[in-house]
């Protein structure tokens, strides 16, 4: 197994976000809820890819993408795409934009 990226998602709760591969070369996302024993594991092949999330954000007004973080919001896995001062929340399972939030 190997970890390709690590991030921290701060939504209603904080999650440590890891993207990587298993020994069988299956790509997975792992979310660990801070201060809890809750761990969520997702097969990346079963939802929106990081690249698709960027494209969905751009279709909805994002310019240059600063950062993309896998996270968990309102009981569902999401991609948070940061562009400038705006955050685009893309549903991992439904492959669509859930919300756009600006600072």
Give the residues covered by each predicted segment.
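Conserved histidines in hydrophobic membrane contexts and catalytic metal-binding motifs
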Residues: 9-39, 51-103
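Short extracytoplasmic/periplasmic juxtamembrane "stem" segments immediately C-terminal to an N-terminal membrane anchor
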Residues: 1-3
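Second-shell loop/turn segments in exported
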Residues: 40-44
